């Protein structure tokens, strides 16, 4: 665990530049355009899951995705503007965003470690999602909205740390497998993703955090 924490706190080259200037340094050429739309081709080269750390020390501009995105606050806190509204996330919180969600991230400081977990839509089994707490599952509606005629008022979910007590340990294992590759790491990541989705579905309250109107 300490090895992973030390690794994530190491400053990347982009972070070093942003720390000096306080200005955003694009990590992809597509980010140089206004409100860019990031596509699958940028991330999923012969892999099913993409995990990265958000670069600190400068705001990350407004952008949208062509894939499902999970933000995990590994340490510290994070302020994001999602679809025009500001939210603050703290250590252990998760933000799950559907395809087309637009968000920007305020400047992260030294102790603010935010992890991105991106996965292709076609890697999620429709059959397994149908079993996730039935049709009342908010996660089910969120992930399947493109495959049905459902209309949702928002296309993201925030889960607080107290609602997902078992998820951090699972995510830490996935992050370790991703950055410290060993035999069968890719297979472990694939299966861990399914378990992660079930844990998230289990944690979703039935009535308190409705996103469907």
List where the protein language model places each region.
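N-terminal regulatory/effector-sensing and dimerization cores
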Residues: 46-140, 146-148, 182-186
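A hydrophobic/aromatic-rich effector-binding and dimerization subdomain
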Residues: 2-19, 38-39, 108-176
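Proline-rich intrinsically disordered, low-complexity coils
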Residues: 26, 36, 59-61, 154, ...
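Short, Lys/Arg-enriched, Trp-marked, Pro/Gly-tolerant hinge/linker segments that flank
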Residues: 157-161, 178-191, 198-213
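Short amphipathic alpha-helical segments, especially helix-boundary/capping motifs
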Residues: 13, 32-33, 44-45, 51-54, ...
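Amphipathic, well-ordered alpha-helical segments in soluble domains
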Residues: 69, 166-170, 192, 196-199
